[in-house]
Amino acid sequence: MNTVKFIGMDVHKKTITIAIIDEGRQKQPRIYGSIANQLEALDKFCRKTVSTAARLHFVYEAGPCGYGIYRHLTQKGFDCMVAAPSMIPKKSGDRIKNDRRDAVMLARLHRAGELTAVYVPDAQDEAMRDLTRAREDAVVAARKSKQRLNAFLLRNSLTFAGRTKWSKAFFNWLSDIAMPYPAQQVALQEYIDTVHENLKRVNRLTDQIRQLVPAWRLAPVVSALQAARGVSLIVAVTVLAELGDLSRFDNPSQLMAHLGLVPSEHSSGENIKRG
């Protein structure tokens, strides 16, 4: 008889461990086993399982493997949830954890309706988010390379007499420095070159964002955000790429809660602590 099946998947880089449980509180889960973390292997499992099920409900935890499995399954017409790991109910006395138990737990909790789904971004939004995060990585790398160069200069008592660091005059001054030992000269030049390379990387990624934003579905919202004082193109794109579709928030309070900009309280007895 065809039944509704809930399928818990413990997803790793190379494998997916699968547990299946039928609807109905008396039904017990069973371990299907592990398959390769490849879409072809997942399709084969679906073809084999769907013949004995009225509906399949998949679930796996959000993690480093991303949303590829979710998008593939939903495009095939299956129901799939990506569960928030921080919201999964835990048993305090449970000291055993392995892939099979995790898959069974996900299947059980999904059947019971006790899991909370994470927001899965649109593929184009996620692509823009990858680009803005790549730029942020470049900004961090540039800042650290500047700090290392500054530390080298300070350690060797080299002080710039000009007013503004990282200006053309500053780099001209750097190029005129002659260190007493060849090894130090090589080190100085490497620090300088690294700063130049990282700054070029930041500029290159910034230009790419400017070129790609007009074709992005959220381009009108980017323009609207820029109407606010102090909000540049990069800030607007970064915020929207991280938040995704703003219509998923029913009201401003939900958006503020998502960002963590809500009051908190940790009080007990006479101790009152609000933040």
Model-derived regions: residue spans:
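A detector of single, family-specific signature residues
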Residues: 1-275
